[in-house]
Amino acid sequence: MAVQTKGYQAGVKDYRLTYYTPEYTPKDTDLLACFRMTPQPGVPPEEAGAAVAAESSTGTWTTVWTDLLTDLDRYKGRCYEVEPVPGEDNQYFCFVAYPLDLFEEGSVTNILTSIVGNVFGFKALRALRLEDIRFPIALVKTFQGPPHGIQVERDRLNKYGRPLLGCTIKPKLGLSAKNYGRAVYECLRGGLDFTKDDENINSQPFMRWRDRFLFVQEAIEKAQAETGEVKGHYLNVTAATCEEMLKRAEFAKEIGTPIIMHDFLTGGFTANTTLAHYCRDNGLLLHIHRAMHAVIDRQRIHGIHFRVLAKCLRLSGGDHLHSGTVVGKLEGEKDITLGFVDLMREDHIEEDRSRGVFFTQDWASMPGVMPVASGGIHVWHMPALVEIFGDDSCLQFGGGTLGHPWGNAPGATANRVALEACIQARNEGRDLMREGGDVIREACKWSPELAVACELWKEIKFEFEAIDTL
C-alpha cells in the first residue's frame, strides 16, 4: 500500500517497478554480476532478480523519503536480464549491472560487502549463488593486484620452461620446529623448488612461529648451497591481528626468506590486501591458501563460485593461489577449473559459458596469479597435471612426497624425475594424455626412487563425481 504526499509516495511497491530494466545496455564502467537464483514459490523471476539488484545496491523493503535527496537512477543496481538455467527447474541466471560509483577504489572488502553482504538472506529467495563478476577496467586500475606476478617470480627463481614443484610438510600439526626444518631440508635437497606450511600452522605451543622461521630458513640455505638452485618455503604469517601478521612478515624478510603465505579467506580481504602491499614494497613473494573456500563455494545453488573468489584474490593480491587439481582428492571439474585458472593468470579472457566464464574480463596488464594444484596427487598424475596446467603452475605434492617408503628426499627426487621426464616428452612432441604412463615407466628404469613411488601408488585413485558441474 502506498500513501501519496506532496512530491513523495510512501509505502511498499514491487522491486521490479524500479530495479528490473531489461531495456538497459550495460556500460563499460559498470561492474556486472551473474547470480544463480532460486525464487520462493510464487515469486516471479523478474521480481526476484530486481530484489537482488535492489538489496545489493540502493534499495530497502519500503520506499523512503530520503530517496528524494539523491539520484537513484544514477546509483541503483539494475537487473537487466533474467534467463532460465538450462536443465534446471525454478533456477534462473540473473544479470545485474552496478554503477562504478557504488564501490570504494581498491577495496575488495567493500565490493563484496555490497554485492553479497546482505542479499543472501533475503526471504524471497530459496537459494542464491554468485556465479561470476566482470570488473570494469576503470575499477581494476585502482588495485595493485599481485605483489609480483608469474614472470617476476620466474626471474627471481631463475627457473623456466616447466611447472614449479612443491610439498606441504606433514604431519601438518605436532612437529617441533627443528624436526619441521629437517623435513623441509630433505624435500628441498631432493629436488623440490618449494615446501610449504599447512594452512593451520600459525604459532601453536608445540612450534612457535619464530622458531619455525629460523629452522626453516637454515634448511633453505643449506639446500640451496648443496643444489645450486634457488629454494623457498611458504612461511605462513597468518595471525590473530594485522599487526602481528606484519610483524611476522617483517621477520621473514629480515632472515632472507623469498616467500611467505597467507590464508586469505579466514584472514580476510582487508588483511590480505594489506599484506600484498607489504610484499610488493619489501620484495617478498606471496603464496595464498584458500582454507574455508568449500564452505562458501561447494554448493551448486547457494554461495559464491570459486571463480569469483579467485578474481577477488587477484585484485586483492597474491602470487600463488590454490586452484584444485582435477585429478586429485579435492573437488574440481576440468573445464570449470581451467576456466578460473585462466582468469587467474591470463590478461584477457573471453566469455565462454562452457567453462563457466559468464563475462569477458580484461585485467589491464595486471600481473597474473600462479595456480597451485594440490591435494591427493602423486607421480602417476604428473603427465595429466603437466598437460592440464601447463608451465605456469605449481604442482604441490604433500603425501605424494613424504609418503615415499625411502623418505622425504627420495620422494622429492621421484617427483622431480617424473616432472623432468614429462617435460622432455612433451617438448619432443609426445602426447602426455595418451602416452603419459609409458613416459613415467620409461623414467623408472633409470630412477629407483621413481620406480618405488610408482609401485606404491599404482592403485590409488580418487574417482567421485564432481558436485559443481555445468
From Swiss-Prot:
It comes from the Bacteria. Its EC number is 4.1.1.39. One of its GO terms (cellular component) is carboxysome. Mg(2+) binds at K196, D198, E199. It is an enzyme of class 4 (lyase). The modification N6-carboxylysine is found at K196. GO terms for molecular function: magnesium ion binding; monooxygenase activity; ribulose-bisphosphate carboxylase activity. The disulfide bond which can form in the large chain dimeric partners within the hexadecamer appears to be associated with oxidative stress and protein turnover. It catalyses: 2 (2R)-3-phosphoglycerate + 2 H(+) = D-ribulose 1,5-bisphosphate + CO2 + H2O; D-ribulose 1,5-bisphosphate + O2 = 2-phosphoglycolate + (2R)-3-phosphoglycerate + 2 H(+). The record marks K329 as: Transition state stabilizer. InterPro entries: RuBisCO, RuBisCo_large_chain_AS, RuBisCO_lsu_C, RuBisCO_lsu_C_sf, RuBisCO_lsu_fd_N, RuBisCO_lsu_N_sf, RuBisCO_lsuI. One of its GO terms (biological process) is photorespiration. The active site is at K170, H289. Keywords: Bacterial microcompartment, Calvin cycle, Carbon dioxide fixation, Carboxysome, Disulfide bond, Lyase, Magnesium, Metal-binding, Monooxygenase, Oxidoreductase, Photorespiration, Photosynthesis. Its cofactor is Mg(2+). SUPFAM superfamilies: RuBisCo, C-terminal domain, RuBisCO, large subunit, small (N-terminal) domain. PROSITE patterns: RUBISCO_LARGE (PS00157). Substrate binds at N118, T168, K172, R290, H322, S374. The basic functional RuBisCO is composed of a large chain homodimer in a 'head-to-tail' conformation. In form I RuBisCO this homodimer is arranged in a barrel-like tetramer with the small subunits forming a tetrameric 'cap' on each end of the 'barrel'. Belongs to the RuBisCO large chain family. Type I subfamily. RuBisCO catalyzes two reactions: the carboxylation of D-ribulose 1,5-bisphosphate, the primary event in carbon dioxide fixation, as well as the oxidative fragmentation of the pentose substrate in the photorespiration process. Both reactions occur simultaneously and in competition at the same active site. This is Ribulose bisphosphate carboxylase large chain.
